Curated annotation (Swiss-Prot):
Binding positions for S-adenosyl-L-methionine per the UniProt entry: 74, 79, 124-125, 138
Protein name: Ribosomal RNA small subunit methyltransferase G
Compartment(s): Cytoplasm
Family, as annotated: Belongs to the methyltransferase superfamily. RNA methyltransferase RsmG family.
Enzyme Commission designation: 2.1.1.170
Keywords per UniProt: Cytoplasm, Methyltransferase, rRNA processing, S-adenosyl-L-methionine, Transferase
Signal peptide (from-to): none
């Protein structure tokens, strides 16, 4: 399947407004340029960029309000951060990324698509205070460590929206060894046995 056919398949499966699609196209076009000079997306993954990467990020929108302020940890190639920013133009997304080349791409995509978003270059654990009611991260860290990274927001009442793969239950069990939290596991629309974990009311077990 070509990238064009993959885009058509994504659009057939999701309700995307014309304005949002324009922003998404600008993001993906920018990624296409940058991937030629940076290791952002592998060549074997590109033909499924829409159904695999955009689609996997798109399903998080079911749990993120239109006006949400959100922080995305370890944003990399912009999934889900750029996709959420493209779809939630009334909110704001702050993406935290430590690699300079990736930050340069993220800023270029934000400018090209005119997104309500910003990039903080640095390690997540050294990030300054950032307003956020929601926290996302995709393929960033196992859940126990992810909760450590996200704790500055989660412990103040933010909601975690984390896509997880087939071993999510093992990660959940491990995370409960040092964190108390309420959660909901929603089956992923990306196929397989992955889920979207919605995590609230987070507190360290020894607090």
């Amino acid at each position: 399947m070509s990238e064009r056919d993959d885009r058509a398949a994504f659009l057939a499966a999701n309700d995307v407004s014309r304005e949002t699609l324009d922003r998404l196209d600008r993001v993906i076009d920018t990624l296409d340029v940058w991937r030629q000079k940076s290791n952002l997306i592998g060549p074997k993954e590109w033909p499924q960029i829409w159904t695999r990467h955009v689609g996997d990020s798109w399903q998080l929108l079911d749990h993120i309000p239109e006006t949400a302020h959100l922080v995305d940890l370890g944003s990399g190639a912009g999934f889900p951060g750029l996709i959420i920013a493209a779809a939630r133009s009334l909110g704001h997304v702050t993406m935290i990324e430590s690699v300079g080349k990736k930050c340069a791409f993220l800023r270029a995509a934000i400018q090209e698509a005119d997104l309500s978003a910003a990039v903080h270059q640095g390690r997540v654990e050294a990030a300054p205070p950032i307003k956020a009611e929601f926290v996302t991260a995709r393929a960033f860290a196992p859940l126990p460590e992810l909760l450590d990274y996200a704790a500055p927001w989660l412990r103040k009442g933010a909601v975690g929206v984390f896509p997880k793969g087939e071993r999510w239950n093992e990660e959940l069990t491990a995370a409960r060894q040092r964190w108390n939290f309420a959660y909901e596991a929603i089956p992923s629309r990306s196929g397989g046995s992955g889920v979207i974990l919605i995590i609230r009311e987070v507190a360290r077990r020894n607090d």
